[in-house]
């Protein structure tokens, strides 16, 4: 009898020491913050063993897979999260990001549209959807999204730069030059912006002196694509 009581006590102790679903999830998040993504996935899998309906664990696992550039596996995990609960914008946004990395721009836009419908306050959705629309050459819609971002934060240099690319695609070199000036004012290390500014100044407006100055700046910043322009058009 005493032996049986002993084993019952041991089992009760082990059971009480078993981490809860929330504790496992929180540890997975901690490991994510420490960039230990594979270990984090193991903890999220343990959560899902306890509760296969935990949509947050599927979403978090997808993020960890995304960080490992395992985009197809991430998409699968985000999709499972959505199947369990489609009321949160997060898995739609995250799945859109994975599609964006795969250059599956149309699928990305569809997910960003859904995410935006669920929460229109998330500025990152507008920016990333703008990138996907840029990839689809839907320039006017991309400009709209980048403008939404810039309304909230005019100092977002990447939004300025990508807006400029959309404006060039939309045959608006005047607007593009303004956006590119804004870009290099905000980020003086953006060689690609100096390059695009210089090319646009020379090709659209015949501004050789200013264009060459910006092309040389791009080259000095390590943007090697500027070299052929400098060699061909900017030698005295």
Language model features with spans:
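Helix-start (N-cap) detector for alpha-helical repeat units in TPR-like alpha-solenoids
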Residues: 21-22, 55-56, 89-90, 123-124, ...
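Bacterial Sec-dependent N-terminal signal peptides
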Residues: 1-27
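Structural marker of alpha-solenoid helical repeat scaffolds
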Residues: 50, 84, 118, 152, ...
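Canonical tetratricopeptide repeat
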Residues: 60-63, 67, 94, 128-131, ...
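Structural signature of tandem alpha-helical TPR/SEL1-like repeats
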Residues: 34-42, 68-80, 102-114, 135-148, ...
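Alpha-helical segment of the N-proximal tetratricopeptide repeat
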Residues: 22-56, 60-63, 67, 97
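Terminal, low-structured helical/coil segments at or just beyond the last alpha-helical repeat
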Residues: 17, 23, 195, 199-236
């Amino acid at each position: 009898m005493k032996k049986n009581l002993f084993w019952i006590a041991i089992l009760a102790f082990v059971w009480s020491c078993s981490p809860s679903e929330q504790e496992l999830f929180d540890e997975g998040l901690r490991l994510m913050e420490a960039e230990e993504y594979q270990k984090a996935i193991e903890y999220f899998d343990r959560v899902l063993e306890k509760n296969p309906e935990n949509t947050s664990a599927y979403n978090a696992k997808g993020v960890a897979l995304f960080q490992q550039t395992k985009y197809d596996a991430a998409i699968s995990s985000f999709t499972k999260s959505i199947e369990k609960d489609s009321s949160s914008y997060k898995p739609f946004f995250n799945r859109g990001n994975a599609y964006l990395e795969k250059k599956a721009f149309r699928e990305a836009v569809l997910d960003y549209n859904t995410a935006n419908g669920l929460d229109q306050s998330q500025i990152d959705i507008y920016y990333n959807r703008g990138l996907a629309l840029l990839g689809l050459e839907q320039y006017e819609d991309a400009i709209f999204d980048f403008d939404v971002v810039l309304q909230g934060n005019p100092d977002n240099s990447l939004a300025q730069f990508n807006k400029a690319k959309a404006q060039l695609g939309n045959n608006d070199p005047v607007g593009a030059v303004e956006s590119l000036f804004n870009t290099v004012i905000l980020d003086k290390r953006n060689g690609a912006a100096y390059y695009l500014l210089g090319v646009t100044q020379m090709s659209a407006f015949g501004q050789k002196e200013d264009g060459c100055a910006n092309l040389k700046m791009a080259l000095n910043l390590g943007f090697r694509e500027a070299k052929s322009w400098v060699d061909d058009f900017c030698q005295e």
